[in-house]
């Protein structure tokens, strides 16, 4: 087999990984958007669709991982090519987790459907989701361009989502203190808000991976963070 043919086959394998990552990203975005829409509108059918779609994302991550391992074994890539493949594995894992967070939000739709969500809280959740989805979309666009400058710019904006999450966290605590009947639905909403905030963290993870893929170095400095909920109590995934 000629060297040119081998390189052509290797290029196709890299293109496969890039294409599948893009497909995963599109589905993850849709799942998050649908999960929040289902939550705000008490749409049980849409919530169930999100839950079902998660298996597609899980399968895609597994297929990307398997393809990456086979490609490394066959081609023994070095330097930027190896970073490209390893980066694909890391990004696929982050996108799979984004899908899990969307699914977890969708699962809570049933729990809060009967009580309804105050419009002010619904707007807060929608705004938080909009910011997280913009960050996710932008980082997927940067994945296509492999721009380290743009990747670093996205990484430095993570604190905006944290600040909105902290504000929403406080509002939910206030609702719970005002009326004990709000405790159960607001607890579910706290978990949903944390799910959405974590999506921003995964977008930042992807930005850091892209930076590494493009430069071979890790981004310098600590991530900017503005999550102040630790002073009020904490909510975990």
Curated annotation (Swiss-Prot):
It is found in: Cytoplasm. Keywords: Cytoplasm, Phosphate transport, Transport. One of its GO terms (molecular function) is protein homodimerization activity. It comes from the Bacteria. Residues 217-237 are annotated as: Disordered. One of its GO terms (cellular component) is cytoplasm. One of its GO terms (biological process) is negative regulation of phosphate metabolic process. InterPro entries: P_transport_PhoU, PhoU-like_sf, PhoU_dom. Belongs to the PhoU family. Plays a role in the regulation of phosphate uptake. Homodimer. This is Phosphate-specific transport system accessory protein PhoU homolog. The lineage of its organism: Bacteria, Pseudomonadati, Pseudomonadota, Alphaproteobacteria, Hyphomicrobiales.
């Amino acid at each position: 087999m000629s060297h040119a043919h081998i390189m052509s086959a290797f290029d196709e394998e890299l293109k496969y990984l890039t294409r599948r990552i893009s497909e995963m990203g599109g589905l993850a975005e849709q799942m998050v958007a649908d999960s929040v829409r289902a939550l705000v509108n008490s749409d049980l059918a849409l919530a169930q669709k999100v839950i079902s779609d998660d298996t597609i994302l899980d399968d895609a991550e597994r297929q990307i991982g398997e393809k990456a391992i086979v490609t490394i074994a066959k081609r023994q890539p070095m330097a930027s090519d190896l970073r490209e493949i390893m980066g694909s594995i890391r990004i696929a894992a982050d996108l799979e987790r984004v899908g899990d967070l969307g699914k977890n939000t969708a699962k809570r739709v049933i729990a809060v459907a009967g009580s309804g969500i105050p419009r002010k809280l619904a707007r807060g959740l929608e705004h938080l989701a909009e910011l997280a989805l913009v960050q996710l979309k932008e980082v997927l666009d940067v994945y296509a361009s492999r721009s380290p400058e743009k990747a670093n710019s996205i990484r430095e904006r993570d604190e905006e989502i944290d600040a909105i999450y902290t504000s929403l966290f406080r509002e939910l605590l206030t609702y719970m203190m005002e009326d004990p009947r709000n405790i159960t639905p607001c607890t579910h909403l706290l978990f949903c808000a944390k799910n959405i905030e974590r999506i921003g963290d995964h977008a930042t993870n992807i930005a850091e991976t892209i930076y590494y893929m493009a430069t071979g170095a890790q981004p310098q400095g600590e991530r900017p963070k503005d999550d102040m909920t630790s002073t009020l109590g904490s909510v975990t995934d």
